[in-house]
């Protein structure tokens, strides 16, 4: 097989935070089993062995949640042991982890650094913005713990990105958020659209990101980013980087920006495999990694159905001048009714207005980084 990438949930939906906008919480609430607990050692070894035996060239293990840190440091030390044990083909192995940061201490930071993990740290901006939606299970603020995690990552030279969820509130404070990240010298940023629960009415929650708010957010963020670029202070913002890749290469490395789905091989802690992190539902369970090869999982009827359903292009997109840049966007923003065709992207108008506003400057950046 070609190189393989997995998204793994070692603690299932378990988390020590209770973020108001958590999309995975809403997904797990709609499964027969809300949480599968911590991944057992036999599942971990079976997964590692299978991937290293079947992949060619390199492979990627990306740990998410819930909160993956809840699996414990010993779990990840065991992961490293198993990767060494079963890597007979001498593959290049990439490990990454997404965390809320509240449980990071010196030992965790040291481990992540020594084992070259790329880390995504969830932080929504300065204290008053971050704490609005990201509280722990007791309703307590989490900002100081997350800021401490960032300091430890810098101390131990852990490579990390900042993951910022864009809500109605954060969209209105993009200047304050960007300045804060700049003051902290965070150079790699991902701004992630806040998702309303799947198949619920969009825009009904206080945190819901409405199209008009997203339009303003993109324009304001781009102005700040572009000014820094002109001043020789380039900041990596994943969405803008993805647009530049599309302009220069015809496609993006970011999932959701190429218009059609691929199989992401999302592995729940019991070994169940799903095609996408946004669809870890009983309906889309492909099988179990303990019982099936990666090729068998990929070739299931459910996976083919999931991927094929993303191919249909909306009639509005066919005549849109921005389609080659947008490609219809992420499936999750086109899916509003269960068992029906995908619709026009919820943020279609936002993207149209943003492209009209920013495209000439995007081309200028692209020409300067060729």
Swiss-Prot record:
Active site: 277
Binding-site residues, [4Fe-4S] cluster 2: 255, 261, 276, 330
Enzyme Commission number: 1.8.98.7
Residues involved in [4Fe-4S] cluster 1 binding: 15, 19, 22
Cofactor(s) recorded in Swiss-Prot or TrEMBL: [4Fe-4S] cluster
CDD domains listed in its UniProt record: Radical_SAM, SPASM_anSME
Binding note for cofactor: Binds 3 [4Fe-4S] clusters. The first cluster is coordinated with 3 cysteines and an exchangeable S-adenosyl-L-methionine.
Pfam families the UniProt entry points to: Fer4_12, Radical_SAM, SPASM
Pathway of action: Protein modification; sulfatase oxidation
Gene3D superfamilies membership: Aldolase class I
InterPro entries according to UniProt: 4Fe4S-binding_SPASM_dom, Aldolase_TIM, Anaerobic_Cys-type_sulfatase-m, rSAM, SPASM_anSME, Sulphatase_maturase_rSAM
All residue ranges annotated as the Radical SAM core domain in the record: 1-227
Binding positions for S-adenosyl-L-methionine per the UniProt entry: 21, 66, 122, 134, 195
Catalyzed reactions per annotation: L-cysteinyl-[sulfatase] + S-adenosyl-L-methionine + H2O = 3-oxo-L-alanyl-[sulfatase] + hydrogen sulfide + 5'-deoxyadenosine + L-methionine + 2 H(+)
Function as written in the Swiss-Prot or TrEMBL entry: Involved in 'Cys-type' sulfatase maturation under anaerobic conditions. Catalyzes the post-translational modification of cysteine into 3-oxoalanine (also known as C(alpha)-formylglycine (FGly)), by a free radical chemical mechanism initiated via the reductive cleavage of S-adenosyl-L-methionine (SAM).
Similarity remark: Belongs to the radical SAM superfamily. Anaerobic sulfatase-maturating enzyme family.
Protein name, entry field: Cysteine-type anaerobic sulfatase-maturating enzyme
Organism: Clostridium perfringens (strain 13 / Type A)
């Amino acid at each position: 097989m070609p190189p393989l990438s997995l998204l793994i949930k070692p603690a299932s939906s378990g988390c020590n935070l209770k973020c108001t906008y958590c999309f995975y919480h809403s997904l797990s609430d709609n499964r027969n089993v809300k949480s599968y607990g911590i991944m057992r050692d036999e599942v971990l070894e079976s997964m590692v062995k299978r991937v290293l035996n079947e992949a060619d060239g390199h492979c990627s293990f990306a740990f998410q949640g819930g909160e993956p840190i809840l699996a414990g440091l010993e779990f990840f030390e065991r992961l490293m042991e198993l990767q060494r044990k079963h890597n007979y083909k001498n593959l290049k192995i990439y490990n990454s982890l997404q965390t809320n940061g509240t449980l990071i201490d010196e030992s965790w930071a040291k481990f992540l650094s020594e084992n070259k993990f790329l880390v995504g740290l969830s932080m929504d901006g300065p204290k008053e913005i971050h704490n609005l939606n990201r509280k722990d299970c007791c309703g307590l603020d989490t900002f100081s713990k997350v800021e401490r995690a960032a300091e430890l990552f810098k101390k131990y030279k852990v490579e990390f990105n900042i993951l910022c969820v864009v809500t109605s509130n954060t969209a209105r404070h993009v200047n304050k958020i960007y300045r804060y990240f700049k003051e902290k010298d965070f150079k790699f940023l991902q701004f992630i659209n806040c998702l309303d629960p799947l198949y619920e009415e969009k825009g009904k929650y206080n945190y819901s990101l409405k199209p008009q708010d997203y339009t303003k957010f993109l324009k304001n963020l781009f102005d700040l980013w572009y000014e820094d670029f002109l001043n020789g202070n380039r900041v990596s913002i994943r969405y803008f980087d993805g647009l530049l890749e599309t302009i220069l290469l015809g496609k993006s490395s970011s999932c959701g920006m190429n218009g059609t789905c691929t199989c992401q091989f999302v592995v729940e802690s019991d070994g169940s495999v799903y095609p996408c992190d946004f669809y870890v539902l009983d309906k889309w369970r492909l099988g179990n990694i303990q019982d099936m090869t990666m090729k068998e999982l990929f070739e299931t009827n459910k996976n083919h159905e999931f991927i094929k359903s993303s191919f249909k292009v909306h009639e509005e997109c066919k005549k849109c001048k921005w389609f080659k840049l947008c490609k219809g966007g992420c499936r999750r923003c086109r899916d509003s009714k269960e068992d029906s065709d995908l619709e026009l992207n919820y943020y279609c108008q936002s993207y149209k207005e943003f492209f009209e506003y920013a495209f000439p400057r995007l081309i200028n950046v692209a020409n300067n980084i060729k």
